[in-house]
């Protein structure tokens, strides 16, 4: 499986064409059933990133990455030599406790790779990006200049 440009994948409006494009770009052996709300959240996140980044088109993530046998899914995952960026997408209101629990669980699974992990959740209905620090959540303003991705 290959990482894909989230900018590219959010330009296509037709879900069937998008599934074909995602399969071609990622190299999956099957068509991924894309959820409409997740696509809309990804579009909203990409639009926000465009306001503060010139090269959003270059951001590459593994979309809907699953750990075999565990069935654990990561919405957006970027793996580099020295760090991992995990972004979970939400469309509706989710409690901070639920977000924290999910991000801590994700961090646990990803920690075996031995890299610095940056964990985020983007809630599109609130246009809210939160980051997991050590064990707490902090609100991030997307326009902040320090971005790990």
Could you describe each region identified by the protein language model?
Residues 85, 90-138:
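Nucleic-acid nuclease catalytic cores
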Residues 140-149:
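Single conserved hydrophobic/aromatic residue that forms the stacking wall/gate
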Residues 73, 88, 144:
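Acidic-residue sensor for enzyme active/binding pockets
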Residues 66, 138-141:
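Extended hydrophobic/Leu-rich segments
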Residues 53-81:
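Active-site metal-binding core of divalent-cation-utilizing nuclease and nuclease-like domains
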């Amino acid at each position: 499986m290959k990482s894909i440009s989230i900018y590219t994948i959010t330009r296509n409006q037709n879900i069937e064409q998008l599934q074909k494009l995602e399969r071609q770009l990622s190299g999956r052996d099957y068509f991924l059933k894309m959820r409409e709300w997740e696509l809309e959240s990804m579009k909203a996140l990409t639009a926000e990133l465009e306001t503060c980044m010139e090269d959003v088109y270059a951001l590459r993530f593994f979309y809907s990455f699953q750990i075999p046998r565990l069935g654990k899914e990561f919405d957006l995952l970027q793996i580099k030599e020295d760090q991992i960026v995990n972004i979970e997408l939400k469309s509706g209101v989710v409690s901070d406790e639920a977000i924290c629990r999910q991000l801590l669980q994700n961090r646990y699974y990803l920690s075996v790779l031995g890299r610095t992990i940056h964990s985020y959740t983007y809630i599109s209905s609130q246009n809210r990006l939160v980051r997991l620090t050590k064990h707490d959540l902090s609100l991030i303003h997307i326009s902040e200049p320090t971005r790990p991705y």
